Structure formats: C-alpha cells, structure tokens
Swiss-Prot record:
Molecular function terms, GO-annotated: serine-type endopeptidase activity
Keywords associated with the record: Disulfide bond, Glycoprotein, Hydrolase, Protease, Secreted, Serine protease, Signal
Enzyme active site: 168, 232, 308
GO cellular component: extracellular region
Classification via InterPro entries: Glutamyl_endopeptidase (IPR050966), Peptidase_S1_PA (IPR009003), Peptidase_S1_PA_chymotrypsin (IPR043504), Trypsin_dom (IPR001254), TRYPSIN_HIS (IPR018114)
Signal peptide: 1-23
Intrachain disulfide bonds: 153-169
Protein's UniProt name: Serine protease 23
Annotated localization: Secreted
Gene that produces this protein: PRSS23
Residues modified by glycosylation: 93, 199
SUPFAM superfamilies per UniProt: Trypsin-like serine proteases
Length: 375
C-alpha cells in the first residue's frame, strides 16, 4: 500500500476524496460523485476493563463552537487521524476492546487485492415536521429504515444487521450509558397482525403501531468521540455503529460520502426520527443546509431530542446503474448556540460522512476494505 505518514500531500489525500468526478459534467441531474477512497484497517486490538455503564442517556449534544470556530481548527495530522479513527467495541456480555488502525492510500492496481444557559429551541418558526402515519408509509422505504434505540435515540438501517446512530446515544465520552449492555433496537410494525381490532381502513385515525425489539450484539464507537468529548473535536466523531444479533429483513439505506452542500439537490437534506415530543410517532423533515465545515453540516431542520442519531440522507442520480438512489451522508447529532458577529444564533448539527469515516464505517459493516472502495 502507498502512503508516507506525516507527509502533507499524503494527509491531503486522506482528508479529501481522491479522484473525485464532477457530479454534473454533461448531466443535468444531481449525480453522486465517484470517489477513490482511502483505506482504514485494524492494526492491533487489545482488551479493556469492563465499563460501569453509569452515564445518563443524553438525547442531544450541545456545543458552543460554531461554523467559524470549526473552520479555524487545524486539520488533524496523520497520527491524530489514526487516533481519532481507532475505536472501542462493546460486546453484549459487557466486555470491550480497543482497536488501533492504520490509514492508507492504495496504489493503482492494488484495489483488487484483498457558556450562558439558554433555553434550547430546535423548532424554527412554524413547525415544519411531518408525523408519518399508516403502515403503507411507515413500513415502506425510506421511512422503514428509521429505528428506535432503547436508550431513546433514533438509528438508521445501513446493512442487513447494522444500524448507524450517534455516539452520544450510547456513550457520553467517558463511559457507556445505562442500558447499553442490554441495548435493543425497535422496529415499528402493526399492532394487530390479522387486522382484528385495528382501525378501519376508511378511518381518519392513524393505524396503531408497536415496536418489535432486537438485541444488539456489539457496538463500535470511534476514539475521536471518546477522547474528544470534553472539547469541540468530539462532535466531529459523534457516530456509532450497532450490529444486531440477527438480520432485520428490511430494506436498508447505504451510506455515502457527503458531497459539498452546493452539490446537494436544492442544497437540501432529509431525515426521519423519533422526536420525544411526539411519542410513538416517526417524524420526517427536510431543510436547507445553512453552512458546513469538513466534518459538520449546519442546518435549521426542526427537531427535538430523540431525533439524535437519525440518518441524514439525499437522493441523487447513480450514473453507473442509471437510477436514482438515496444514501446516508450524515448523522444528526444535536443543537448548538453560537455567537455570530456577537449575536447568538442556533443551529442543528449533523456529522458528515467524510471519505475517512466512510472507509471506517464500511469496514465495520463489511469486514474488509475491498468492498469499501466506492463512496
């Protein structure tokens, strides 16, 4: 594998997608860019002491470091990037490990080898969220990819047995939250299998739904979150992957590298979550991206605690398959009050899936890098 650690050009290749193809070229359609991606591989794994699972679950994360603050932060060095992308794995029996990683760029031809207290408002003006009712919507794609965590957050199905969510939903930066050892993922389904007792199909009332729960086998959390939660670098790594004990048998949404905001269709993002002010309801929303940094998307989508961990997605044209495709390009993290030219302004924040994060998450899902070369 190629790459000279610490070399500035090498670092630039790691942090920026390699060989990006213009998303538009001769096509009028907003098209998924083609990327040649870096590789994130485990180098060593060692056992850690069992955690105490003593943290209180937080349904949102706040930070005072806004877009300008993040834009002024230096890019991580190669060694720092390796530290941030190293990760902890928690197993259902309470044991855990730490895995240190290496980061590489493949040579051509190698790819075929194996502050002040404020009341936080997350509703901006008129509440533009939509509660999704009826099994014809809730049980069909893309809404069916949204699931509920037993800790109170939202997650998104990204593979046959995997759920993407926010790290703070299971870990507070110091230890795991209460209930994580017996973490479950809930799938909405009709309350009545045969329809008896359910609302009549012509009724104006929404059909009653319930959650069916599946236990989690193991979780992965990047060390960038665990090491950095005490400062503002942590929010850049507020994501986690959950592996279920059995397949969920539903259609899932693939992850993708987040394009620049100006390349998103209409500059807009979408996500659905289980906001805690509408218990039992799946809530969908969309809005424009207001600002961005390399790791974060700043927007003012209406959201409440409980929506944290929702997969942020867009729909773009897939040139190779000649079809439209939705992909998860970020994870909804939480809320920020920031000072903009001396005036307070608030944003909702999503963690972008960068090329390095894509390589890491994809490896967690696939278990190899060969299947993780297309973002």
């Amino acid at each position: 594998m190629a790459g000279t650690p610490g070399h500035p050009i090498f670092l630039l290749l790691l942090l920026r997608a390699i060989g990006q193809v213009s998303p538009y070229s001769t096509h009028w359609k907003p098209t998924w860019p083609a990327y040649r991606l870096p590789v994130v591989l485990p180098q060593s794994t060692f056992n850690l002491a069992k955690p105490d699972f003593g943290a209180e679950a937080k349904l949102e994360v706040s930070s005072s470091c806004g877009p300008q603050c993040h834009k002024g932060t230096p890019l991580p060095t190669y060694e720092e990037a390796k530290q941030y992308l190293s990760y902890e794995t928690l197993y259902a029996n309470g044991s855990r490990t730490e895995t240190q990683v290496g980061i590489y760029v493949l040579r051509s031809g190698e790819e075929q080898s194996s502050g002040k207290s404020r009341r936080k408002r997350q509703i901006y003006g008129y509440d533009s969220r939509f509660s999704i009712f009826g099994k014809d919507f809730l049980l069909n794609y893309p809404f069916s990819t949204s699931v509920k965590l037993s800790t109170g957050c939202t997650g998104t199905l990204v593979a046959e047995k995997h759920v993407l969510t926010a790290a703070h939903c299971i870990h507070d930066g110091k230890t795991y939250v209460k209930g994580t050892q017996k973490l479950r993922v809930g799938f909405l389904k009709p309350k009545f299998k045969d329809g008896r007792g359910a609302n009549d199909s012509h009724s104006a009332l929404p059909e009653k739904m319930k959650f069916q729960w599946i236990r989690v086998k193991r979780t992965h959390v990047p060390k960038g979150w665990i090491k950095g939660n005490a400062n503002d670098i942590g929010m850049d790594y507020d994501y986690a992957l959950l592996e279920l004990k059995k397949p969920h048998k539903r259609k899932f949404m693939k992850i993708g590298v987040s394009p620049p905001a100006k390349q998103l269709p209409g500059g807009r993002i979408h996500f659905s979550g289980y906001d805690n002010d509408r218990p039992g309801n799946l809530v969908y929303r969309f809005c424009d991206v207001q600002d961005e940094t390399y790791d974060l998307l700043y927007q003012q989508c209406d959201a409440q605690p409980g929506a944290s961990g929702s997969g942020v997605y867009v729909r773009m044209w897939k040139r190779q398959q000649q079809k439209w495709e939705r992909k998860i390009i970020g994870i909804f993290s939480g809320h920020q009050w920031v000072d903009v030219n001396g005036s307070p302004q608030d944003f909702n924040v999503a963690v972008r899936i960068t090329p390095l994060k894509y390589a890491q998450i994809c490896y967690w899902i696939k278990g190899n890098y060969v299947d993780c070369r297309e973002g």
